[in-house]
Amino acid sequence: MLLGASLVGVLLFSKLVLKLPWTQVGFSLLFLYLGSGGWRFIRVFIKTIRRDIFGGLVLLKVKAKVRQCLQERRTVPILFASTVRRHPDKTALIFEGTDTHWTFRQLDEYSSSVANFLQARGLASGDVAAIFMENRNEFVGLWLGMAKLGVEAALINTNLRRDALLHCLTTSRARALVFGSEMASAICEVHASLDPSLSLFCSGSWEPGAVPPSTEHLDPLLKDAPKHLPSCPDKGFTDKLFYIYTSGTTGLPKAAIVVHSRYYRMAALVYYGFRMRPNDIVYDCLPLYHSAGNIVGIGQCLLHGMTVVIRKKFSASRFWDDCIKYNCTIVQYIGELCRYLLNQPPREAENQHQVRMALGNGLRQSIWTNFSSRFHIPQVAEFYGATECNCSLGNFDSQVGACGFNSRILSFVYPIRLVRVNEDTMELIRGPDGVCIPCQPGEPGQLVGRIIQKDPLRRFDGYLNQGANNKKIAKDVFKKGDQAYLTGDVLVMDELGYLYFRDRTGDTFRWKGENVSTTEVEGTLSRLLDMADVAVYGVEVPGTEGRAGMAAVASPTGNCDLERFAQVLEKELPLYARPIFLRLLPELHKTGTYKFQKTELRKEGFDPAIVKDPLFYLDAQKGRYVPLDQEAYSRIQAGEEKL
């Protein structure tokens, strides 16, 4: 009887709310009935129906708005224009560094000045312009102004230097580069290798001798530019907005394509799913060259009229003071930041704020409750997603440790799945029919999302590099003939459909809030070590988020000038990409296809009791690699050694 009532409830929801055809409803009910497992199904239904209905309604609302924007060819600048009309004099952005407040009208005028200036310099719809600067209000105004003209912004990671920076600038085919004065030295390092036709503009303090020749000071030029809205470009909702550089799965940073619909979808799902309000004030200390800071954070300002406080960089000691000063109600985080805050000594300010929600990803289950209780934050809004992925998740009901959920009852509504993979090679495991095998509750698997290019919520826009796209797409995943996006991440689903992040697979790992490409680091280290075989991988360190980089180097003699090596690394790699641990061994074992076998290396880690090869770690205070003995290992395990 209860099972019948449950099926009737599903029937009504599927037909009246989701408006699915009768055939699909019928087959779904039959499948649910046959696979329900009796009381187990009833238990899952009772515990999750409220969550699933809310999630379904959020998805329907966003789908309806996306469909409307698609039909009316609305773009982010057009949507922002309607926000300006609603709140012209409301504060849009606050830059903490200078306490600069911009209203929506001021942001609109600044971005229009950018569009008119670039148009006068010959840039047109479809061209690319790069932005290379630290967080501040102008960062938002620059890419928004470019979007008003139809120019696609390439948002460059400010940690990149030399080869990686040059790679991003050249592959983007940018016609212009706007860099902050704080980035001048990095631009000078690659200037000789840049295309001579690339127009250079510097924003911020002006020192002619500190910038490359032919560089122009942008700020006074924008003041003289017209502030009216330029003619609208022929852009639609699924056209390119900007590029965010990500390490992807292999090699140098790749330009992930962000179209207008993707920007809207990511911001809207967070807004409606976590019940945000137009009068919320967001504290955004995440990099604006990443999707979390620029889409999830800034998107609430541009699309929903919220005020966003921008900080140049995260500061654990100033975090709560800033929240109090600006009356912030929502704070953004990555898991590492939460740990830094917990490591701070208790102080009055941490309980005098008005923060009601912490929004982000990567908060470990082990510190989740401690974080929310110590700082009195009622809602932890954890989500999962990547710039280019089509299978974002949201933990809408604050289930401790979960990064999201998918309905066990109506799983077909949101076509994502965990599929079995080979633990050593991370290759997809397929059944006799050639289709990927779905994981059961409690079984780790790679998260995949079905690709439907005609659906803005299911499409995969990918990268500028087509070769990179091919590595992220698999065929015959849900059924024969389909395509799915491969996240490269291992998750686990429990009986109720909650999903928990387990590991980052493939050729990347996450450290200090950044994705580290092992292939890129391996190439750099090998070049510095006279082309020696080098395998780079991530290892777990107690008390830290993500995985610390470790490099196994083939050194038959065991000799290596580690002091010089550390000095050169400072110039070659950003801080988060430098290996924390080194292992010198006679040779590296390879597969038949000449790939390094990293599984055993990862398992052995950096424990000198297990690893008999010479081990070293990067001493943060000395700035060089020192021997890793049992005493140092114990300090690291106890969290007494700063990494």
Curated annotation (Swiss-Prot):
The keyword Phosphoprotein appears for this protein: no
Tissue: Expressed at highest levels in brain, testis, colon and kidney. Expressed at medium levels in heart and liver, small intestine and stomach. Expressed at low levels in peripheral leukocytes, bone marrow, skeletal muscle and aorta. Expressed in adipose tissue. Expressed in brain gray matter.
Known EC number: 6.2.1.15, 6.2.1.3, 6.2.1.-
Membrane topology: Multi-pass membrane protein
Gene3D superfamilies: 3.30.300.30, N-terminal domain of ligase-like
Keywords: Disease variant, Endoplasmic reticulum, Fatty acid metabolism, Ichthyosis, Ligase, Lipid metabolism, Lipid transport, Membrane, Nucleotide-binding, Transmembrane, Transmembrane helix, Transport
Record has Repeat as a keyword: no
Catalyzed reactions: a fatty acid(in) = a fatty acid(out); (9Z,12Z)-octadecadienoate(out) = (9Z,12Z)-octadecadienoate(in); (9Z)-octadecenoate(out) = (9Z)-octadecenoate(in); hexadecanoate(out) = hexadecanoate(in)
Highest taxon, organism lineage: Eukaryota
Listed InterPro entries: AMP-bd_C, AMP-bd_C_sf, AMP-binding_CS, AMP-dep_synth/lig_dom, ANL_N_sf, Lipocalin_CS
GO molecular function, one term: long-chain fatty acid-CoA ligase activity
GO CC, alphabetical: brush border membrane; endoplasmic reticulum; endoplasmic reticulum membrane; membrane; microvillus; plasma membrane
Subcellular location: Endoplasmic reticulum membrane
PANTHER family documented for this protein: LONG-CHAIN FATTY ACID TRANSPORT PROTEIN, LONG-CHAIN FATTY ACID TRANSPORT PROTEIN 4
Pathology noted in the entry: Ichthyosis prematurity syndrome: A keratinization disorder characterized by complications in the second trimester of pregnancy resulting from polyhydramnion, with premature birth of a child with thick caseous desquamating epidermis, respiratory complications and transient eosinophilia. After recovery during the first months of life, the symptoms are relatively benign and the patients suffer from a lifelong non-scaly ichthyosis with atopic manifestations.
NCBIfam families xrefs: PRK08279.1 (NF006134)
Any further remark recorded for this protein: SLC27A4/FATP4-mediated fatty acid uptake is associated to paramaters related to insulin resistance, which is associated with disturbed fatty acid metabolism and homeostasis, such as obesity. SLC27A4/FATP4 expression is positively correlated with acquired obesity.
Name used for this protein in its record: Long-chain fatty acid transport protein 4
Lineage: Eukaryota, Metazoa, Chordata, Craniata, Vertebrata
UniProt gene name: SLC27A4
